[in-house]
Design a protein with these regions (language model features):
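N-terminal presequence-like segments and the immediate start of the first folded domain
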Residues: 1-55, 59-72, 78-127
Length: 127
């Protein structure tokens, strides 16, 4: 097992690692819409929150040497299912022709008032 910890400003207060490689798979912990360099919550709309959370997922992928087209599954958490449309638009732009399995889960609130949290699972090698 290998821990994947991309650099970011400040200290992570949660008891978890950004990513874990195990048995040929990368498991990316939930990435909030928080800027990793400033540690500030995204001030924008749902599209900007989604873009930032996906960029944070991408940051973990890249740190592990994994490409977006190796992602096999994402879970997207949001406080309201009404955001499904704009989340889907940004998600489609991010992944392009690649369509990993996905679920969008409507929750109550997310930590720090974020509008999106995304976790992912990726293969270390593509077929």
């Amino acid at each position: 097992m290998q821990m994947v910890t991309p650099p970011f400003k400040g200290e992570n207060k949660g008891h978890y690692t950004a990513g874990v490689i195990s048995n040929g798979m990368l498991y990316v912990s939930g990435q909030l819409s928080i800027d990793p360099d400033t540690r500030e919550v995204c001030p924008g709309d749902i599209r900007e929150h989604t873009r930032l959370a996906l960029n944070n997922v991408d940051r973990v992928l890249k740190h592990a040497g994994v490409q977006r087209d190796q992602v096999v599954m994402c879970r997207v958490y949001t406080p309201d299912v009404k955001y499904w449309g704009p989340i889907n638009e940004v998600y489609a732009d991010f992944f392009g022709d690649h369509k990993p399995a996905r679920v969008i889960v409507s929750t109550t609130t997310l930590h720090f008032g974020c509008l999106v949290e995304i976790e992912a699972v990726a293969e270390l090698t593509s077929d």
